[in-house]
């Protein structure tokens, strides 16, 4: 289930409207930068992702609210998308840190984050409400220095090999 671990599920028309409105509100407030992901190979919209909790004064952001339709999962599209977003974050915006969070039970998302070079930092215990109650969140990140040392090249190699 695509929305099983989502803090803001977008299943159903009303939930989808709420999801989009929250993303647009964050954009207006300059705390969130949502992106629609388009797959050029299939000429189809595949999903979305966003920078959020953008803190210019600390040169940090979080990257998440990522989801892809079933046909796009496991295709390498996420790695391509994350490469471009991380490149933009570190090389254009000059950020020092990009943080990722997920439900600590969401093994698929955690594996995807680790596969792009994220390092696990720890677990925030019962840190937020979800549609099914309190949840633990895993925190991972990529630092600017790590991006330039090896994460960028390793991720690019994975993309090329795919």
Question: What are the language-model segments listed below?
Answer:
Residues 110-111, 149:
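Alpha-helical elements of the RecA-like P-loop NTPase motor core of helicases
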Residues 74-88, 111:
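Conserved acetyl-CoA-binding loop-helix of GNAT-fold acetyltransferases
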Residues 101, 119-133:
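Conserved catalytic-core motifs of GNAT/GCN5-like acyltransferases
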Residues 113-114, 140:
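Conserved active-site tyrosine of GNAT-family acetyltransferases
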Residues 100-109:
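Conserved beta-strand-loop-alpha-helix junction that forms the acyl-donor binding cleft
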Residues 1-75, 88, 131-162:
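GNAT-family acyltransferases
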Residues 91-101:
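Conserved GNAT acetyl-CoA-binding A-motif
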């Amino acid at each position: 289930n695509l929305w099983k671990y989502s803090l803001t599920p977008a299943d159903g028309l009303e939930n989808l409207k709420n999801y989009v409105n929250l993303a647009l509100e964050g954009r207006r407030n300059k705390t969130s930068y949502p992106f629609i992901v388009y797959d050029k190979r299939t000429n189809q919209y595949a999903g979305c992702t966003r920078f959020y909790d953008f803190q210019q004064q600390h040169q940090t952001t979080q990257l998440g609210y990522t989801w892809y339709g079933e046909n796009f999962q496991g295709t390498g599209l996420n790695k391509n998308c994350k490469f471009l977003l991380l490149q933009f974050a570190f090389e254009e915006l000059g950020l020092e840190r990009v943080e990722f969070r997920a439900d600590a039970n969401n093994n698929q998302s955690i594996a995807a984050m680790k596969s792009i070079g994220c390092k696990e930092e720890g677990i925030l215990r019962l840190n937020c409400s979800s549609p099914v109650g309190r949840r633990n969140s895993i925190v991972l990140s990529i630092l600017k220095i790590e991006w330039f040392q090896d994460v960028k090249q390793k991720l690019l190699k994975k993309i090329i090999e795919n």
